[in-house]
């Protein structure tokens, strides 16, 4: 992105017929406007300084020009505090505007394919359904699939989401104005107005504070999560259902029945207490109330809008008797409109929705109006009324009016209910142990300490208490603050289910679950709150979900579930949950524990073993993938990731976390949001119905080889991170981890405990820190050594390499693993990483650790190219390669500035401007990388 029309970092291939021509033009336009803004508001000198830095950075990046690197260092090291802030903001906004142009171009290219009548692309529901129909899957099988499926991205609040709402709003405005130029035949005068609006938006953006002035509260995080319903979910999810039904109808050559609602958005925001003391019972209630308020407000608006269009007159049409009955109960219309039954019906629905919002305690517009209507008992009654309208229209030759907005509203009501999204509860197993220990102490005469009992003894006591009708809690005041807090949470959970329905709060996740005892402890706590009962009629209104996170726990999780299903009482309990058990697998902590290769491999093996155990016990399995935005935390393209799962492990059931800045990048723009949701649906359909990974059954030696690779990779990773003397110091000094803790980007502390031990550090800031210094260890370290050892020990190096190449060609798991590593390596930069290493005060430690990192990086590159046959990174993904090539020259100066600022700050310059500049660079680099945490 150039600040003026003379400079141009983009390759010269730039004719109007070239497919990326519009992208280049958008980038130039936005860059020129940002440059003009800097010139107008900061002066010509500042403009020239920023442009000099930009051109020098481009020269260094493009030509590996050492003189340019030295020149860049000299400029950046001599900036004043004021100049530093301006330069950081300039390059941060370069990255942001490039992202906007790039997202728009993705949409542009997809629309071009559609207009040209090109075949549907991988990841589209159109192609997925074509493939399953071609295989011979009939309409009834597809209907059964949708009826039993659940696909659920779950929004979580984590300290890597650095965008403010104000910034997101202006991103959308700029994108809308660019779309206007793209799709509309503007007159010269309209084009001038469009450019002025763009300039105004960019100027406002430049003068808008990027950083939050105070740390986010959980309430703030709840509101931030809700904006994506307005941006994308409320309208795009019904659109996807309509698209699926229309495709099925075309394939069946007849009207397809309505498919079941299987795609739903979940949330942890306001229910995730693990390590966050600010999530209380009041906060959880607030989250449920805000969810309900938003969706009821949406329904009221849509009913108003649709009702205004339903001007059909009884003098010209007929209606069903059901609709007549519904219209007769509605408030009156003016005499001039008394012959309009559909309007009367929508007026009645509108009144009942307002009464419902008042009944549920939602504070939304219209609730203070005089209204004697009866509230809906639940969302099913609302859906029933909409169905009466739809049937009447279809029965009386008005089918088209039953489509569009009315069809979408009916689907929204079925998907979102009156609760909007299922809110998950989550807490650490150690907290449950503490609470149960207190309950045990207060209710038994046993001298033993609960925590000192063996696990089998605990299980025996827990099962006995679960069968016993008595309550262990008489008064909250008898217990510690921690126990009181947990008991109040569960009491509030029962109240939320009573008010908003069981679907509002259906899941309880146990962090760091390691055994059956942890599951039964939660069962007992749910029993105390009236959410679960054992005995003659066992049932539960909550799914108990163990989260297995460490390498050891992943290896043992199938045995844990086998033991759990061997308990007759628990098996009976599952019948009340549709005989389905959910298990969550943690990518982040397992990566921090054992490294990239081993984390992925152990999760893959765990899925295989879990599938076998569940099949043997006749229990349905749903896997919940706890992953982040980065490859180091399980991120990467969703389509390939789901297709790479072991056979039988998906079976139409998948939940996965959407975290940090990934939520904004995926779901701010509605077209991109719809595409991402479609991708999840398409991959789940194909993975379930096509059984693409049959290689698992035919090549067991692949697993033997992966076991060897994983063992070597884990040893190399742990040797570096946990066994290298002084590595903790290297990490703390060569990354901005301590400065991240001061950035107001999340409500949770960066560590679970008040400690700077790597074991206690949350996986999110761990990965975020390595991303910011461009080392990105969690996404590749250990792979190079693993392959090197395997090839050398094989005896015949060429034969060993051929085996790995065959595995790569035929096994989706290894393809996805190496593709994700390829992406990480393309964003890493050891030249910049070495500059961060210079911040380490011990020269011997710096030399020792960074030499190990560089050696492993070179081995990774060597063997990645050898196995894939590529000669450069991202050779098979030119779109991503182009994206990184465009953005990197704007990220590099931010990294160089961050290094200099960290050096100043750690040397005692604690000027507020320096702190703010450091935080701005953290924000800017995260924006440029796009999946940093």
Swiss-Prot record:
Cofactor(s) recorded in Swiss-Prot or TrEMBL: Mg(2+)
Source organism of the structure: Nitrosomonas europaea (strain ATCC 19718 / CIP 103999 / KCTC 2705 / NBRC 14298)
Family that this chain belongs to: Belongs to the PEPCase type 1 family.
SUPFAM superfamilies with a match to the protein in the record: Phosphoenolpyruvate/pyruvate domain
Transmembrane segments: none
Alphabetized UniProt keyword annotations: Carbon dioxide fixation, Lyase, Magnesium
Main EC class the enzyme belongs to: lyase
Protein's name according to its UniProt entry: Phosphoenolpyruvate carboxylase
Gene3D superfamilies according to UniProt: Phosphoenolpyruvate/pyruvate domain
GO biological process: carbon fixation; oxaloacetate metabolic process; tricarboxylic acid cycle
Entry GO terms, CC: cytosol
